[in-house]
């Protein structure tokens, strides 16, 4: 029952309070005041905002609480003035306790940056409220973080440029407020699926924005699932990365939903996609040898069509901790595919397929699969997703990806699924026969395929071994081998890849 209420609560917030309509809640302006005590938190409770520097990799160790103005305590806690400083800011909570992701992120940062200060911003008393109240509290928490940073700046060797604020969900907007209120400019803010309800479409001073730090990078992982956007959809950083389109994440699909209902843990399913942003960031810290790349694109549809796999002019970037600051000021939306678990890295390929003489096609679209054979490994049968429709007597572009590094591609096999394998194809075949019964046979002529690797930027052309045998029909396959026919082969790698 509690799990159902969790979903309905998010839905009511999103539907009942459309973006920009909230006036009584005032997340933007006079947020009561810095000494506001939210309902249900007595004056004798622990501090509403605490700064806990983690000095041990043991999650059971509470660390050392910093106190603004207490320089001696700062020294006793082992704060390193010249090192990088990370502030981890959690989001809204139903339990009133830290979730497991926070300990994983702390540990990953400690392993990656051994001399760094890792500070957890504990605002659980203000986050363990109704969602609308927690939203109102983000501003005051941001002010407290800014106050701590202003005090640290009074120390001779401390630099705001070494500060990296990492905020999850509502915590991302807390980081935005902190960057807005602090005296100076924070080095970097990372937003991990910033919360959407009550922030979508509002003014930049009321949410995370590119103005809040020298570099703001954002991961969006839960923007459209089930018609409900828990994470914010709009771009709010210098680079906004949408893994798997920013909606359905691998491992959080319909089968997982059924299992969650059966065991009464629907809240775990809901947070699977929302929390995926955190795990992608952790992955970038612990799996340095397998960095994930994202590619600039105007929208998810074009990316799914395989159009956007270029690294020219800073059009691709690492994701997570390894993301690089872009030279240009305007926002960049970027996309990538991932696996269902760590390491999340996959290998993207753009396929440009020349298709000719698609006889008696009607409105039927072929169900095509490609198998890639490489020097290191071979792929599975990879579906060629038809996002719009097949263009006849033209070049069609597709996106496929593999979970393994195939090495240098050697050959490939194209398969047209027969009607017996798919009820959908059987219906289309029957409909096509009714519209054009005089010539039910169908053929597709494919002379060559060009493959471009997103990760290496290499381009290789493949041709049919026998130019006279380039036709394919349902239930048949075609083999392609490396060639130099039509396209010039390019083996140059992107200079960007060397940044990994």
Swiss-Prot record:
PROSITE patterns: LIPASE_SER, PLAT
Protein name: Endothelial lipase
UniProt-annotated glycosylation sites, renumbered to this chain: 65, 80, 136, 359, 393, 491
Disulfide partners: 64-77, 252-272, 297-316, 308-311, 463-483
Organism: Mus musculus
Tissue: Expressed in placenta, lung, liver, testis and spleen.
UniProt KW Zinc-finger keyword: no
Family per similarity comment: Belongs to the AB hydrolase superfamily. Lipase family.
InterPro entries per the UniProt record, alphabetical: AB_hydrolase_fold, Lipase, Lipase_LIPH, Lipase_N, Lipo_Lipase, PLAT/LH2_dom, PLAT/LH2_dom_sf, TAG_lipase
Main location: secreted
Gene Ontology biological process: cholesterol homeostasis; high-density lipoprotein particle remodeling; lipid catabolic process; phospholipid homeostasis; positive regulation of cholesterol transport; positive regulation of high-density lipoprotein particle clearance; regulation of lipoprotein metabolic process; response to nutrient
Listed GO MF terms: heparin binding; lipoprotein lipase activity; phospholipase A1 activity; phospholipase activity; triacylglycerol lipase activity
Recorded coiled-coil stretches: none
CDD domains referenced in this protein's UniProt entry, alphabetically: Pancreat_lipase_like (cd00707), PLAT_LPL (cd01758)
Keyword entries, A-Z: Disulfide bond, Glycoprotein, Heparin-binding, Hydrolase, Lipid degradation, Lipid metabolism, Secreted, Signal
Catalytic residues identified in the record: 169 (nucleophile), 193 (charge relay system), 274 (charge relay system)
Start and end residues of each PLAT domain: 347-482
Binding site for heparin: 325-337
Signal peptide: 1-20
GO cellular component: cell surface; early endosome; extracellular space; Golgi apparatus
E.C. no: 3.1.1.3, 3.1.1.32
Localisation: Secreted
